[in-house]
């Protein structure tokens, strides 16, 4: 496995910037764009071992790269279905789980906003069409909410 799971997250209080963009403290170090359209159906909860955010959406919707990087894994896993893992600058890694289809392959360099997959409902742990989105830094899980740029 690429990562160790640790029951700790980074919880930063939200701040608000101009132009109705929600800004959190983590954004200053590594700002991420929302990886798909939809609504958060389940938040980050390290105590319950839910190490990401679930964004419910329509099957087949575009899943976007949250930041520039390199695809280090694009394939199938039993629990997560079609999974893509992207390595970014400064030790950050993002994971995109339960996709219907993957549009990029391992080794591909990608840019923030590139369509990398289609939202789906694959894998044993999926409970409906959604994207499970995770953020890691140097092998430690972080709460993506603290890094996501979201319009209000």
Predicted segments with their positions:
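Conserved, short, structured surface segments that act as functional micro-motifs
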Residues: 106-152
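Short, surface-exposed secondary-structure edge patches
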Residues: 60-63, 101-102, 106-108
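Conserved beta-strand positions that form and line the central face of beta-propeller blades
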Residues: 54, 85, 95, 118, ...
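Residue-level recognition of beta-strand microenvironments
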Residues: 43, 74-75, 99-102, 119-122, ...
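Short, acidic/hydrophobic/Gly-rich beta-strand patch recurrent on exposed beta strands
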Residues: 53-56, 83-88, 132-134
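Surface-exposed, glycine-biased beta-strand/turn segments
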Residues: 3-80
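Solvent-exposed coil/turn segments that connect beta secondary-structure elements
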Residues: 45-47, 58-60, 68, 76-77, ...
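Zn2+-dependent peptidoglycan hydrolase active-site motif and core
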Residues: 66-103, 129
């Amino acid at each position: 496995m690429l990562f160790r799971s640790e029951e700790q997250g980074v919880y930063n209080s939200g701040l608000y910037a101009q132009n109705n963009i929600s800004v959190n403290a983590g954004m200053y170090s590594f700002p991420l764009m929302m990886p798909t359209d939809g609504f958060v159906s389940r938040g980050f909860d390290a105590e319950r071992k839910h190490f990401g955010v679930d964004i419910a959406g329509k099957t087949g919707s575009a899943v976007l790269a949250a930041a520039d990087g390199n695809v280090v894994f694009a394939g199938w896993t039993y629990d997560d279905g079609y999974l893509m893992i992207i390595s970014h600058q400064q030790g950050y890694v993002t994971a995109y789980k339960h996709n219907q289809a993957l549009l990029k392959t391992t080794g591909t360099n990608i840019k923030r906003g590139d369509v990398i997959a289609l939202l789906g409902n694959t894998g044993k742990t999926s409970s409906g069409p959604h994207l499970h989105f995770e953020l890691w830094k140097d092998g430690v899980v972080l709460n993506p909410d603290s890094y996501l740029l979201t319009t209000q």
